[in-house]
Curated annotation (Swiss-Prot):
Keywords: Antioxidant, Disulfide bond, Oxidoreductase, Peroxidase, Redox-active center. SUPFAM superfamilies: Thioredoxin-like. This is Thiol peroxidase. The active site is at 59 (cysteine sulfenic acid (-soh) intermediate).
Length: 175
């Protein structure tokens, strides 16, 4: 069990913490159109952004920032996961012009939260997801950042470095 902070106060997380190098747990989540989005499948690269709710300022900013940066991640599929209802996620994407990434809801079974160890288990945000970033390559966890303070953004510079930097042409290493 991991612990993060919410406004400086420790909060316990429920579920199994996944580590870099481990097989990525496969889970099915609901997209904004109620179709299924599979997390953890082999054959692709996924950047998973776990957030408490798109209806909070920090989460909304994170989604907007990553929406702008998707092209710099060498064809990786970027998915924002929260407990928001798919309909609310769709409205958020429409209102904010989010078109370059996917949103997925874990509201049905909280399977993502438990299998990735980011389900908040106590306090005011109990039942929501902690802020984290996972990169899944070929079905394996290749990168993980569990953000210590839920109200803060993940370290985007570290993720950029993982993908080879953020050059003008998408981190391809040609500069």
């Amino acid at each position: 069990m991991s612990i993060v902070n919410f406004k400086g106060n420790p909060v316990k997380l429920k579920g199994n913490s996944v580590e870099v190098g481990a097989d990525a747990p496969k889970v099915n989540l609901k997209a904004k159109d109620l179709s299924v989005i599979e997390i953890g499948a082999a054959g692709k690269t996924q950047i998973i952004l776990s957030v408490p709710s798109l209806d909070t300022p920090v989460c909304a900013t994170e989604a907007r920032e990553f929406n702008k940066k998707v092209a710099s991640y060498n064809g990786a599929e970027v998915i924002v996961v929260s407990m928001d209802l798919p309909f609310a996620m769709g409205r958020f994407c429409s209102t904010e012009g989010i078109e370059n990434l996917s949103v997925a809801s874990d509201f049905v079974a909280k399977e993502f939260g438990e299998k990735y160890g980011v389900l908040i288990n106590e306090g005011a945000l109990e039942g929501l997801l902690a802020r984290a970033v996972f990169v899944i390559k070929e079905g394996k966890v290749a990168y993980k950042e569990l953000v210590n303070e839920i109200t803060e953004m993940p370290d985007i510079a570290k993720l950029d470095a993982f993908f080879g930097g953020s050059s003008c042409c998408g981190g391809c290493g040609c500069h």
